[in-house]
């Protein structure tokens, strides 16, 4: 990928509105924090998952975010939010910058290569997955149909000295309950190979951590340490476990578990349909990340594995994303479906049947979000004792948006079900009453204001994108009714869909023919790009073209897309925010739809240049520095990347084969 560098001729920053989008050279992703900042750049973290637990590892080899047993449980390592809130480092003594880092291809196994003055080390990290192990007894947590592979609840770290001699150090200092309860260590046997960490208060209320290794563990207060000199050919393993599943006792056993974990991931990714294209690596990494954000026991899908990574440095826009949003989840299924990965949809729809009460004859209204176990109450609170990432307070757990009224969720849900049902030509019987209820909710409430797709904490408004998604609910609902043989519903719902569309076109379009953020106002909003991606209007409609180009030219900073202008939108918060990466990828897809292929490709290339060294994305990007902001990695961004990249690749292929581009049929 060759990118041309452009510089302003007048010495000032040129705005996107001055001309078409330009491709600039990639900027260093770590330009925000300085070397003196004790917090690593957000983009420096690696992401691990076993589809039950997630963790983040810094480039220095330190586990700085781990919540067990669930991703929304209190943290046991939380240094990403406070440097004293727990860590687990394994690496060479005196060296904190690795020679190289990568994921083993097709997996979520992180490999870090270290060079010292005297030798070389290779460290591999994984959350272990193995063959399904609950044979004689049923799992207490799994509600979905058992698969071939399952989490073993072990964080496994292996070390191999490949050249010379290297001094290896290990430091494991958990801090339970978000650093509110310290740890106490004790040996679990007569030798030094295993130790157990428990909470110093109410240990039965917190997980027990077991550290198993072929190193000699020393207990120093709240910390378990080890230090040894390795020579070429030496191998070390360290396993941290928190359940009854046995940890490896030898390096050979550890290596076998690492191989089985890689095999689990590769068997999953092999099912996908990936193009033979230079961007294939971005697609695969995004797909693996989305899979890693699933919670296999229930079928829920996380928005992100972290809480309170700031959208604005030292600002208040810090939120807990460790929950399952209906919107984010259904969009993620769209992205996976685009790549031929369809199995996760079955589990998520079963999760929806659970939380809506369809499986036990009850009827609950669909919420904006749920806990990964289906919890309906996600009360928000602030943890004042934590400094926050890079001193950005407050640190929040829970999310107060769970009881907001957001009218787009019915459309996203019905669209996702239709996307999968039309290829199978059937709807699960238990799901039809749930879907019918969502259509009825859209009919009942579409004329009312809501807080919109961006969950504004200001006053409810008549957001145009919410009305469009209500149209999607009725449009997809009518098509699902036809599949179900309910022709009267199909006819009735089509008529209401047309009523909604007429209302939007009468009240949500300005004098220029541009769709507006809300009724009665000319402000722009990036969510209106969904108007073309959901087929609300055809791509050749002049209002679609005007809207896409207005957003590209007027709602961008250095070519990257904002959600909205904060000075034009009452979102109930102070301060600025970065550009929303999902919106920039939406713009790529929308530009393809209206035939602006070259412009779309250039923007896509630029966005891919902002990826972290491990091809991961946070929620936002600071356009002038490339700094990642917000929770990390974020499902919303990765799903939009998949759709944008596939849009561009399909457009190129069609243009190459016929000389004429036909807009891609977006699944929505």
Curated annotation (Swiss-Prot):
InterPro entries: 6-hairpin_glycosidase_sf, 6hp_glycosidase-like_sf, GH15-like, Trehalase-like_N. Its EC number is 3.2.1.28. Inhibited by pyrophosphate and polyphosphates. Also competitively inhibited by validoxylamine and castanospermine, but not by trehazolin. Residues 1-23 are annotated as: Disordered. One of its GO terms (biological process) is trehalose catabolic process. Shows an absolute requirement for Mg(2+) for activity. Mg(2+) cannot be replaced by Ca(2+), Mn(2+) or Zn(2+). Shows an absolute requirement for inorganic phosphate for activity. The function of the phosphate may involve stabilizing the protein conformation and/or initiating protein aggregation. Its cofactor is Mg(2+); phosphate. The keyword Hydrolase applies. Keywords: Carbohydrate metabolism, Glycosidase, Hydrolase, Magnesium. Gene3D superfamilies: 1.50.10.10. GO terms for molecular function: alpha,alpha-trehalase activity; phosphate ion binding. Pathway: Glycan degradation; trehalose degradation; D-glucose from alpha,alpha-trehalose: step 1/1. Optimum pH is 7.1. The trehalase activity drops sharply at pH values of 6.5 and below, as well as at pH values of 8.0 and above. It catalyses: alpha,alpha-trehalose + H2O = alpha-D-glucose + beta-D-glucose. The keyword Magnesium applies. Homomultimer of 20 or more subunits. Catalyzes the hydrolysis of alpha,alpha-trehalose into two molecules of D-glucose. Does not hydrolyze maltose, isomaltose, sucrose, cellobiose, p-nitrophenyl-alpha-D-glucopyranoside, and methyl-alpha-D-glucopyranoside. Is also inactive on alpha,beta-trehalose, beta,beta-trehalose, alpha,alpha-trehalose-6,6'-dibehenate, trehalulose, nigerose, and trehalose dimycolate. PANTHER family: TREHALASE. Belongs to the glycosyl hydrolase 15 family. This is Trehalase. It comes from Mycolicibacterium smegmatis (strain ATCC 700084 / mc(2)155).
């Amino acid at each position: 990928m060759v990118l041309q560098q452009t510089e302003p001729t007048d010495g000032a920053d040129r705005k996107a509105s001055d001309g078409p989008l330009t491709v600039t050279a990639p900027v260093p992703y770590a330009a925000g924090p300085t070397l003196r900042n004790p917090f690593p750049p957000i983009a420096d973290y690696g992401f691990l998952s076993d589809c039950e637990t997630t963790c983040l590892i810094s480039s220095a080899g330190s586990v700085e975010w781990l919540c067990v047993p669930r991703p929304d449980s209190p943290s046991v390592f939380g240094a990403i939010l406070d440097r004293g809130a727990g860590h687990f480092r394994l690496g060479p003594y005196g060296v904190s910058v690795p020679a190289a880092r990568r994921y083993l291809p097709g997996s979520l196994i992180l490999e870090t290569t270290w060079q010292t003055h005297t030798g070389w080390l290779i460290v591999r990290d994984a959350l272990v997955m193995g063959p399904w192990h609950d044979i004689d007894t049923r799992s207490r947590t799994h509600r979905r149909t058992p698969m071939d592979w399952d989490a073993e609840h072990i964080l496994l770290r292996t070390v191999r000295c490949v050249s010379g001699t290297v001094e290896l150090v290990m430091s494991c200092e958990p801090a339970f309950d978000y650093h509110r309860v310290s740890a106490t260590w004790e040996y679990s046997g007569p030798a030094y190979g295993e130790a157990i960490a428990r909470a110093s208060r109410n240990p039965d209320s917190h997980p027990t951590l077991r550290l198993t290794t072929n190193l000699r563990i020393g207990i120093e207060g709240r910390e378990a340490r080890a230090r040894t000199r390795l020579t070429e050919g030496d191998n070390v393993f360290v396993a941290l476990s928190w359940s009854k599943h046995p940890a490896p006792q030898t390096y050979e056993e550890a290596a076998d578990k690492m191989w089985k974990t890689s095999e689990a991931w590769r068997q999953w990714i092999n099912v996908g349909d990936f193009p033979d294209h230079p961007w294939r690596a971005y697609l695969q990494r995004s797909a693996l990340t989305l899979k890693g954000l699933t919670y296999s026991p229930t079928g829920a899908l996380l928005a992100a594995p972290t809480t309170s990574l700031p959208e604005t440095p030292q600002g208040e826009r810090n939120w807990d994303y460790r929950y399952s949003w209906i919107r984010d989840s259904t969009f993620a299924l769209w992205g996976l479906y685009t790549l031929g990965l369809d199995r996760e949809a079955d589990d998520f729809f079963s999760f929806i049947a659970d939380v809506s009460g369809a499986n036990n004859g009850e009827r609950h209204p669909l919420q904006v979000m749920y806990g990964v176990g289906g919890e309906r109450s996600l009360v928000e609170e602030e943890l004042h004792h934590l400094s926050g990432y890079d001193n950005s307070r407050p640190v929040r757990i829970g999310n107060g948006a769970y009881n907001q009224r957001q009218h787009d969720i019915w459309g996203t849900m019905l669209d996702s079900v239709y996307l999968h049902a039309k290829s199978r030509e059937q709807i699960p019987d238990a799901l039809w009453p749930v879907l019918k209820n969502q259509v009825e909710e859209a009919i009942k409430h579409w004329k009312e204001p809501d807080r919109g797709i961006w969950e504004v904490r200001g006053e409810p408004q008549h957001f145009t994108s919410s009305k469009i998604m209500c149209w999607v609910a009725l449009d997809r609902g009518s098509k699902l009714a036809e599949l179900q043989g309910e022709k009267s519903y199909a006819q009735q719902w089509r008529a209401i869909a047309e009523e909604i569309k007429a209302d939007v076109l009468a009240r949500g379009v300005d004098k220029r023919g541009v769709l507006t953020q809300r009724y009665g106002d000319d402000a722009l909003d990036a969510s209106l790009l969904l108007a073309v991606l959901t087929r609300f209007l055809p791509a050749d409609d002049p209002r679609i073209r005007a809207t896409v180009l207005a957003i590209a030219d007027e709602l961008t900073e250095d070519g990257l897309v904002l959600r909205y202008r904060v000075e034009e939108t009452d979102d109930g918060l102070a301060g600025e925010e970065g550009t929303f990466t999902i919106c920039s990828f939406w713009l790529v897809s929308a530009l393809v739809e209206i035939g602006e292929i070259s412009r779309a490709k250039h923007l896509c290339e630029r966005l891919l240049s902002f990826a972290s060294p491990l091809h991961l994305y946070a929620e936002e990007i600071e356009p002038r520095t490339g700094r990642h902001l917000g929770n990390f990695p974020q499902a919303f961004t990765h799903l939009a990347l998949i759709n944008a990249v596939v849009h561009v690749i399909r457009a190129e292929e069609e243009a190459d084969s016929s000389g004429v581009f036909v807009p891609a049929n977006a699944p929505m």
